[in-house]
Structures are given as structure tokens and as C-alpha cells.
């Protein structure tokens, strides 16, 4: 079977729902304890999920709306607080403290994040006042509507001591971020419809900006993928969530798709549990519209087992 573009269709696994009743889950991440953690935007909570039973428990309350998650080398959780543009740190006693104030270097809400093994956090922002525009018109689509022309945004590095540095500009809605074994940082540009790569230097600077994967025809029907959350899939491959088609695609450097997961509704974030075969975790919801997502609990965690890529 081939796609309309003539490419061989990638094998597709169908996900099953393991947890529902959420508002809008994002940033599925495996913690040092092996549990799965997600941010539920409109419940203002970080949830800890036991991957053996799929039971969820509140782990942190984030009134400013939680997003990206990661851990310092000592095991303390970092979580992006979107609306007040702070990076929070969960202490051993469960309290949240400010790890870094991002307000001076971000435009609009702070967004998704990746924390590397050295404890450096890499976080994007919206680039404009997305939520302010929606207050004026709750049904507007400031990102993809017919009159949408969002400005570009930045990527910020937060060092373990809380020092904040802008490391990249001109990104078209930087979203999910991950680091490959060779030191390549990959950033999903949602509005740009691509994955952009940088080389991370020893001192944490980003060099060699380049296109890692053009996703303009990478969808199941040869249509474009507007990448949201991403996760390392092993080697030079990345899982990419696809809100448009509903599901996730495993993308190699250069843009080839060699596996897909089909979900029951749009997929806004993806993670990987280190099982054999790998468990691909998809955060899905009926819509990303904040008004609708906050009013209804359509959010789900859906999973599928996908064998590792050959080679």
C-alpha cells in the first residue's frame, strides 16, 4: 500500500484508551521512579500515573497552568507554569518553588520543555498573547485560522542554578523538544510544519541550525503534519504527535515515516515508556480550544506497543 505521494505506507498500530476523564493532557514524561507524569492544563495539575494499573494521582498543583515537565539530576521535578511564565521546582516535601522567572525572555505563555541529563531545561514560548486574543474571541484560531499570522518565538535555556539564556530566535511556535544521543537538539515548529535541529555545544550554546525533517507531506494521506509534542524514539528517530490526522508518527532524520499510531481523537503530545516493545503514550483530546477543553473532560491517555525500527 502506498500514500498519495507514492511512498510506501508506514505500518500503523491502533492505540487503546488506558485513562480518560482528563481535560487536556500534555508532556507525557517518564520520571526517575518509572512512573508516567502528565500535565493536565485545565485541571491545573501534574498527575503521576502508575503504568502497571494506569491509576492517576495528583502530584503537583500549578495554578498558572502546567505544561512541560522534566527532572533535575537529583530527582526534583521541574514544571513550566505557562500563564505566569515561571519554571517551578518541586521540593522533596512536595512544595513548589520558583526555579527561574521566564517573563523577561518570553512573549506570551511559556510552553513545552525538555530537561537534559545535566539539568539544563530547554523551553519554548508562544511568541504572542494567545490567551488574550481568545478572551476577545473565544472561537478564534490565532495559530491556524484564515487570518492567522503569529509572530515567531524563542527557545530558552535554563541552567541548573536558574540562570536564563535565550538560545534561539525566529522559531515558528516552538513546541516539543528532545535531545538525540549525538547531541542534536530537535525542536518541533508547529506553525512551520517541521522539525528543526541544533548542535548543542559543551557550554550549552546552540549552533548549526538546520532542517531535520520537513513534515509538509508526512501525514498518513500525504498531507502535512503540524508537530506538537515529540519524544525520542531511539537512534535518529523521533515520535511526533499529529493533532490534524489524529495519532503519532515515527520520523527519521530527513522526514521518512516508518511507523504510526492511530488514536481515537487528535493527539497533542507523545511519550515513550521503555518497555519491549516500546509503549507509545499519546495524549489526546477532542480539541485544543481552551474554552471547550476547560469545560469538558474529553482528554485521554492512549497507548500502543510498537516494535523498534530496524537498523
Which role does the model predict for each range below?
Residues 2-23, 209-213:
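A short helix->beta-strand "capping" segment at the edge of beta-propeller domains
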Amino acid at each position: 500500500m502506498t500514500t498519495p505521494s507514492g511512498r510506501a505506507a508506514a505500518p500503523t498500530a491502533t492505540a487503546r484508551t488506558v485513562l480518560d476523564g482528563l481535560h487536556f493532557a500534555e508532556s507525557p514524561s517518564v520520571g526517575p521512579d518509572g512512573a508516567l507524569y502528565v500535565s493536565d492544563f485545565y485541571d491545573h495539575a501534574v498527575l503521576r500515573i502508575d503504568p502497571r494499573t494506569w491509576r492517576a494521582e495528583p502530584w503537583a498543583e500549578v495554578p498558572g497552568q502546567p505544561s512541560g515537565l522534566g527532572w533535575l539530576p537529583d530527582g526534583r521535578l521541574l514544571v513550566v507554569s505557562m500563564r505566569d511564565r515561571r519554571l517551578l521546582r518541586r521540593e522533596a516535601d512536595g512544595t513548589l518553588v520558583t526555579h527561574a522567572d521566564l517573563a523577561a525572555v518570553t512573549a506570551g505563555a511559556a510552553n513545552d520543555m525538555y530537561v537534559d541529563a545535566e539539568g539544563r531545561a530547554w523551553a519554548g514560548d508562544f511568541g504572542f498573547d494567545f490567551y488574550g486574543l481568545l478572551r476577545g474571541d473565544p472561537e478564534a484560531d490565532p495559530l491556524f485560522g484564515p487570518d492567522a499570522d503569529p509572530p515567531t518565538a524563542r527557545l530558552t535555556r535554563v541552567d541548573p542554578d536558574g540562570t536564563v539564556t535565550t538560545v534561539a530566535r525566529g522559531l515558528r511556535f516552538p513546541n516539543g523538544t528532545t535531545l538525540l544521543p549525538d547531541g542534536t537538539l530537535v525542536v518541533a515548529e508547529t506553525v512551520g510544519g517541521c522539525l528543526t535541529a541544533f548542535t548543542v555545544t559543551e557550554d550549552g550554546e546552540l549552533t548549526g541550525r538546520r532542517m531535520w525533517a520537513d513534515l509538509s507531506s508526512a501525514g498518513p494521506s500525504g498531507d502535512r503534519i503540524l508537530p506538537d509534542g515529540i519524544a525520542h524514539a531511539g537512534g535518529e528517530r523521533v515520535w511526533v504527535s499529529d493533532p490534524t490526522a489524529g495519532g503519532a508518527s515515527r520520523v527519521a532524520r530527513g522526514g521518512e515515516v516508518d511507523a504510526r499510531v492511530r488514536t481515537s481523537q487528535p493527539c497533542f503530545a507523545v511519550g515513550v515508556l521503555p518497555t519491549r516493545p516500546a509503549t507509545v503514550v499519546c495524549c489526546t483530546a477532542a480539541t485544543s480550544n481552551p474554552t471547550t477543553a476547560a469545560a469538558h473532560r474529553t482528554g485521554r491517555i492512549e497507548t500502543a506497543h510498537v516494535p523498534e525500527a530496524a537498523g
